[in-house]
Amino acid sequence: MWLWEDQGGLLGPFSFVLVLLLVVTRSPFNACVLTGSLYILLRFFSFEPVPSRRALQVLKPRDRVSAIAHRGGSHDAPENTLAAIRQAAKNGATGVELDIEFTSDGVPVLMHDNTVDRTTDGSGRLCDLTFEQVRKLNPAANHRLRNEFPDERIPTLKEAVTECLRHNLTIFFDVKGHADMASAALKNIYTEFPQLYNNSMVCSFLPEVIYKMRQTDQKVITALTHRPWSLSHTGDGKPRYSVFWKQSVFVVLDILLDWSMHNVLWYLCGISAFLMQKDFVSPDYLKKWSAKGIQVVSWTVNTFDEKNYYESHLGSSYITDSMLEDCAPHF
């Protein structure tokens, strides 16, 4: 039965909801009616995941653990550039993770941040810059190997896809926001390059992005990305807010988000994979998701010992900043 937890179902989460509603309403009848209504709504609005065979073509091509170059391999080349894609292929990556953002005139380009300050010789918010302005920036300007990549430009989504396909790399499209724009842009890309249906996936920290993508095209393989405590703490573990009450509110929101991700949102979106920050991944964690028919991909795995552990012991694909050497994580 799909309902049972050990078969990847929803018995555990809905039992929790039922108990919670019993406490709140103090009425078994009302609690049962509300729980049943929530269940019906979830079933009605949820999407079926793509067939697991297709998902495994992307997550474990040739039935092997995949090493995915984060932002194209941001330690080995300027992140989110065509040079990074070429370098990732040269260094033996199975695929690349690429970040999608939009210029002020709606052109989808590769960029992780919402500003251009960190990676380029320019400044300002990407959404305030036209594509013509963005094209003049140097995305290698602040990279440690900038002298080796003197002629790079910020690529469009189409240019990046063309380069990846040329090198037979799988693609993890990481969508930073703009659910409607991103799903429309990606739908156009999948229409133009139909081989992407068996060679790529769309992932995001934002469930609304993944849900919108599934609404737009249910054939696209998708994944939710998650890091526990991401609302209340930065990537290196520091609190985001100095005011106690504000920090406490976001801690509570983190707890709710984490519960929702693991118990409801994965089912609602019909995902095929869950991209989890590596510090929270264990054999039991992989087993839990495997019972749901979902693959776990860990990020960011940046040391030789960690990679060996994922490949030899866990048998789990991972995302890394470097295909060549140990390096610090890029958040």
From Swiss-Prot:
pH dependence: Optimum pH is 7.4.
Role description: Hydrolyzes the phosphodiester bond of glycerophosphodiesters such as glycerophosphoinositol (GroPIns) and glycerophosphoethanolamine (GroPEth), to yield a glycerol phosphate and an alcohol. Hydrolyzes glycerophospho-N-acylethanolamines to N-acylethanolamines in the brain and participates in bioactive N-acylethanolamine biosynthesis such as anandamide (an endocannabinoid), N-palmitoylethanolamine (an anti-inflammatory), and N-oleoylethanolamine (an anorexic).
Cofactor(s) in the UniProt record: Mg(2+)
A molecular function (GO) term: lysophospholipase activity
Residues binding Mg(2+): E97, D99, D174
EC number: 3.1.4.44, 3.1.4.-
Similarity-based family: Belongs to the glycerophosphoryl diester phosphodiesterase family.
Ways its activity is controlled: Inhibited by EDTA, calcium chloride, and zinc chloride. Enhanced by magnesium chloride. Glycerophosphodiester phosphodiesterase activity can be modulated by G-protein signaling pathways.
Membrane topology: Multi-pass membrane protein
Entry keyword Membrane: yes
Cytoplasmic-side positions: 1-3, 270-331
Protein modification: N-glycosylated.
Topological domains annotated Lumenal: 25-248
PANTHER family found in the cross-reference section: GLYCEROPHOSPHODIESTER PHOSPHODIESTERASE 1
Membrane-spanning ranges: 4-24, 249-269
Tissue distribution of the protein: Widely expressed. Highly expressed in the brain and spinal cord, followed by kidney, liver, and testis. In contrast, little or no expression is detected in the heart or spleen.
Domain GP-PDE: 65-331
Compartment list: Cell membrane; Cytoplasmic vesicle membrane
Gene designation per UniProt: Gde1
Catalytic reaction(s) noted: sn-glycero-3-phospho-1D-myo-inositol + H2O = myo-inositol + sn-glycerol 3-phosphate + H(+); 1-O-(1Z-octadecenyl)-sn-glycero-3-phospho-(N-5Z,8Z,11Z,14Z-eicosatetraenoyl)-ethanolamine + H2O = 1-O-(1Z-octadecenyl)-sn-glycero-3-phosphate + N-(5Z,8Z,11Z,14Z-eicosatetraenoyl)-ethanolamine + H(+); 1-O-(1Z-octadecenyl)-sn-glycero-3-phospho-(N-9Z-octadecenoyl)-ethanolamine + H2O = 1-O-(1Z-octadecenyl)-sn-glycero-3-phosphate + N-(9Z-octadecenoyl) ethanolamine + H(+); 1-O-(1Z-octadecenyl)-sn-glycero-3-phospho-N-hexadecanoyl-ethanolamine + H2O = 1-O-(1Z-octadecenyl)-sn-glycero-3-phosphate + N-hexadecanoylethanolamine + H(+)
Glycosylation sites: N168
SUPFAM superfamilies xrefs: PLC-like phosphodiesterases
Binding partners and assembly: Interacts with PRAF2. Interacts with RGS16.
GO terms of biological process kind: ethanolamine metabolic process; G protein-coupled receptor signaling pathway; N-acylethanolamine metabolic process; phospholipid metabolic process
Protein name: Glycerophosphodiester phosphodiesterase 1
